[in-house]
């Protein structure tokens, strides 16, 4: 039997405790061997952030240092051109049975992605509820967890305002943000 591998795509700008909680809940409930944290290389759905892919890769490595459930993957960072999940899943397919981990907000928008039918064909999908977006019906597994009201944009806002971010990100992520002078 092939290992079940969770795939969590994110801008990782920065990764936060909500990502960690989702990965831990999914790993336990879905019997995942590991969860790949896949920082988006070149976003296809929004303008690229000021923090380039290598900066966001280092943040993914930092969260993986604090949360052993994660393994940071460079699959999108190293691939030229826009990042599309259908392509990412194709590249990761040899690793095992893939389970794409999504928040309910992302799942609700799945049909707007490039080649959503290929995404569905290349993996199982597991969905966790996000604040403000109830779990939609559909052909997916459910990740039971308390919704965590944290966002990367809130972390960036707090850093810019000089407010604490302790408890919103892991210690290694906070240290990387401070060391690199990010979001100022």
Language-model segments: what does each one mean?
Residues 1-184:
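Nucleotidyltransferase catalytic core that binds NTPs
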